[in-house]
């Protein structure tokens, strides 16, 4: 017994030493490096903002000659969200659903003003509701945008500076979609219908009609752009940054800092989704699932530092007097498990549930969560839910535990006979081992159990 206790305390001491060594030699240097990197990035950001405060806004031009238009640099002045929205109120379409409030900027048809009605900044219900998206000329600009890349033959196609016209609807709700339109000088008409459900999924359907005399080819693009990193403290136990499920590359999770060194460019793919995720919220885009596209996670340091997840699809051709239709999805909201699971099923979005970081043991953590969530919804109390989950898990493992306890009882019952064998064979370890194994066999005891 004393020997067993000594081994037990040695094991505890070694475990503590391993944890302390890991903290001292691995975590502390890593935390210090992160602190220095954040401090350097902050100084660089302050320097860049000081240099560009008098510069005009850039990156607002339309897409031309096959290039993806720039995401926009810093604005001449930094406004609050309310100031920016008020400045462009005449060219905005209001969004009002049970879960969302905000507006769409007709310039670029950009979704850059979005708040979550049912979530607050603190547990105090009187605190401000969460702001997810903000215009580019605010301190923490964050938005999504869909556009096109054309050529000289297509003329000017929708891009960041395109001024769309509201052709039907006056407010975007979960029951009333809106339609925007734009016609260029080559006779190509773009009609964009935007709808949203009662939670967080936007459906953007573009109809492109060619009334010209020659076929035209153009590529659609989509992007999620974010100015500066979120100010919330990062956590090592979950991923915050770029995320996507892209073709054969599968689930891709890239930290913001990683793209500051080199952009992440997965292989050309068909199907999937991409965007950015925070601890509780996310913004992702789901391109048309039947057309190949090139995806990219990148960082731009010109002007205000910004991060961008974007894709550009292979070109499609619209014949004269013909039209085509493209449908994109945009998720922008809270990472609610039932909602995300429903979207994965109803929209056939591959592995969309991985938008939530379930950790390495996804096959264990998600079922455990669903079980606990079921009990919470039934009883309305997390303490009771945890207790019920513990009982269920214990019940599932009861047969295994029962065998273990039975084996331990048998081993205890055999202890006197074991002592007799030790006294009989003394230092003859080989004979003692053979006699012990024979005893286990006769008594039908499995010591491993």
Predicted features along the sequence, with ranges:
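Membrane-protein biogenesis/insertion across secretory and organellar systems
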Residues: 1-395
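Membrane-interface amphipathic helices and adjacent TM-edge segments
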Residues: 24, 43, 188, 321, ...
């Amino acid at each position: 017994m004393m020997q067993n206790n000594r081994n037990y305390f040695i094991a505890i001491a070694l475990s503590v030493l391993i944890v302390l060594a890991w903290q001292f030699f691995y975590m502390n240097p890593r935390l210090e490096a992160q602190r220095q990197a954040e401090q350097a990035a902050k100084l660089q950001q302050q320097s860049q903002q000081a240099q560009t405060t008098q510069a005009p806004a850039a990156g607002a031009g339309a897409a031309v000659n096959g290039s993806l238009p720039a995401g926009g640099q810093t604005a001449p002045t930094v406004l609050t969200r309310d100031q920016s929205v008020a400045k462009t109120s005449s060219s905005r379409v209001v969004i009002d659903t049970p879960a969302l409030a905000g507006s769409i900027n007709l310039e670029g048809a950009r979704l850059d003003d979005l708040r979550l009605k049912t979530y607050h900044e603190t547990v105090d219900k009187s605190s401000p509701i969460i702001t997810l998206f903000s215009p580019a000329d605010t301190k923490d600009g964050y938005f999504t945008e869909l556009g096109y890349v054309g050529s000289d033959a297509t003329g000017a196609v929708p891009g960041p500076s395109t001024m769309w016209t509201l052709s039907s609807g006056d407010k975007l709700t979960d029951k009333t979609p809106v339609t925007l339109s734009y016609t260029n000088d080559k006779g190509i008409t773009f009609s964009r219908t935007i709808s949203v459900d009662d939670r967080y999924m936007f459906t953007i359907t573009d109809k492109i009609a060619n009334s010209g005399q020659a076929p035209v080819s153009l590529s659609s693009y989509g992007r999620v752009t974010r100015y500066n990193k979120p100010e919330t403290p990062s956590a090592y136990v979950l991923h915050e940054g770029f995320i996507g499920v892209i073709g054969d590359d599968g689930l891709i999770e890239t930290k913001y800092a990683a793209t500051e060194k080199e952009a992440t460019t997965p292989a050309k793919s068909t199907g999937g989704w991409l965007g950015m995720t925070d601890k509780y919220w996310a913004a992702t885009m789901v391109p048309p699932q039947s057309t190949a596209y090139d995806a990219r996670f990148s960082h731009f340091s010109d002007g205000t530092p910004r991060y961008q997840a974007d894709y550009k699809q292979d070109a499609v051709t619209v014949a004269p007097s013909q039209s085509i239709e493209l449908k994109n999805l945009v998720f922008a909201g809270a990472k609610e498990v039932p909602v995300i699971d429903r979207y994965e099923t109803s929209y056939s979005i591959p592995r969309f549930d991985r938008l939530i970081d379930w950790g390495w043991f996804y096959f264990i953590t998600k079922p455990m969560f669903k079980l606990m969530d079921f009990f919470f919804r039934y009883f309305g109390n997390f303490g009771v839910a945890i207790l019920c989950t513990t009982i269920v898990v214990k019940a599932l493992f009861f047969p295994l535990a029962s065998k273990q306890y039975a084996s331990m009882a048998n081993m205890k019952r055999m202890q006197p006979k074991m002592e007799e064998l030790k006294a009989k064979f003394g230092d003859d370890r080989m004979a003692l081992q053979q006699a012990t194994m024979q005893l286990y066999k006769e008594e039908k005891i499995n010591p491993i159990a």
